Amino acid sequence: MRNNSTLIFVLGSLLAFVGPVSCGQAASEQKASYGTRVKYQAGQKIEFPDFTVEYVGERRKTMPVYPRGFLYYDFKVIKGNSEKVISWTTGTGIIDPTDFEFDGKSYYLELRRSHKLGKLNDNEFVIWQGRFGSK
């Protein structure tokens, strides 16, 4: 009886440790579809049908003609050995999507506001297939 109690205790402890670890790993990756709101955070990988997206972070770039600078939000698009960084900014205040090409296909990324879905939360983006304005 004592051996069974020890075995149950060891297995229970192992499950208590492995369960949250595996759930945490699953939470760091999510699947998404084109044309849907997607929540993002730094370091999280989001799997779309044609590629994976990872939010890298934000950066400010200043220029002599605009010393205040522009705030850029950078996303890394990955598929196999191919990788590309997509940068979105409001620039001087125009909130438009960023067109990009990856693996021979056209897409666009929306932040802050989607032309079809409306206002987006600070931690949401939308990726559409095709070029913005061509639909």
Task: Give the predicted meaning of each segment.
Residues M1, V18-C23:
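Generic low-polarity alpha-helical segments
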Residues M1-V10:
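Bacterial N-terminal signal peptides that target proteins for export
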Residues V10-G19:
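Bacterial N-terminal signal peptides
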Residues C23-K135:
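Surface-exposed, beta-sheet-biased, low-hydrophobicity segments with strongly acidic/polar composition
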